[in-house]
Amino acid sequence: MGDHNLPDFQTCLKFSVTAKKSFLCMYRDSVSKEKLASSMPSTCDIQLKRAINDAYPGGGIKVTVLNSTTASLDSLATTHVKEFEIVIIPDINSLLQPDQAKLVKIMRDCTVAIEKAQSTRIFIGVVHWNNPVQPSGAAKDGDEAGKPAPKTRIFLPTSFRMGAWLKHKFWFACAPPYLDFESSTESSINTRANNSIGMAEEEKQEPESKRSIILNEEANLNDVFVGSTVRRYILDIMVHLRTHRLTYNAKAGGVYTNSLDDVVLLSRLIGLHSGKMFVSPSHVKEASRWYFPMHLELVQRSSMDSSLLYGSDPNLVDEMLEKLAKIKCEEVNEFENPLFLESLVVKNVLSKVVPPV
């Protein structure tokens, strides 16, 4: 992936199956028909199900499309998994808060079952996003034309309408499998350039061979060495993200305590995918670009900026956020990435934190 592009779906699927982790898929509502992979309907769950079946044909992976209803969540909670199951949630943003709480409990129970080696079930949540017109289309709660913008004006709305406790159950967000990735050719990870070739070679293998590859990667994952200096490097990145000028300090910038373990795991996968049995700072940088943009909580309005406590003018903060909203609106269309600004924050932090030698 490029610095500001979403990770590709195929690699994310491979990593998530190996690590037994759930992830999100960012689906743009206004995607054009020219970008579809086939003449099939553009329903996201159909495309995802086909992509998974193509990646693991007959490989012992069951794909279930979940209806966003309370009844389907209840049935999912009582269903016992006998094989590797991937559950697709078509529109996770539409879940009501009680349903989100049920889904969190189900995912927590699945994590416990995975740790006990009883069963394996991961989730793919589909997030529908759109790029609103900025800045004139920024939300004003009860504000009349010609009056100064109130503190409730949101300049940088987020694409996620779910609770943070649910969002943190997913470890990163990726692009849909049917988008054109020609703009993503400049990848900082060497293996991404050969990804399409590797996928084509894997599809030619027998299902048993493909399943054995997954098991071998799971067995080798813990053997990938992570030095203490690399862990300290990840912690330095987390601290700088929490205290960044654009992150919401009241929520620690969205960087929570489990981020260290998740980034270490993702770095190990990237290192193993690169043919290495150790994690280098370049692997950590790539993992950070994958992981942190989805979790970051950015300042959306001047009242969320902690610098107001030290004398900053709210109107000047609003002007800065309004200019950032214009830049975000333009770049989101170019990169097809609703998390462009979050990716920019991660890139800025990576340029400031000195990696271990």
Curated annotation (Swiss-Prot):
Disruption phenotype: Decreases resistance to doxorubicin. It comes from the Eukaryota. May be involved in telomere capping. Belongs to the MTC2 family. This is Maintenance of telomere capping protein 2. It comes from Saccharomyces cerevisiae (strain ATCC 204508 / S288c). The gene is MTC2.
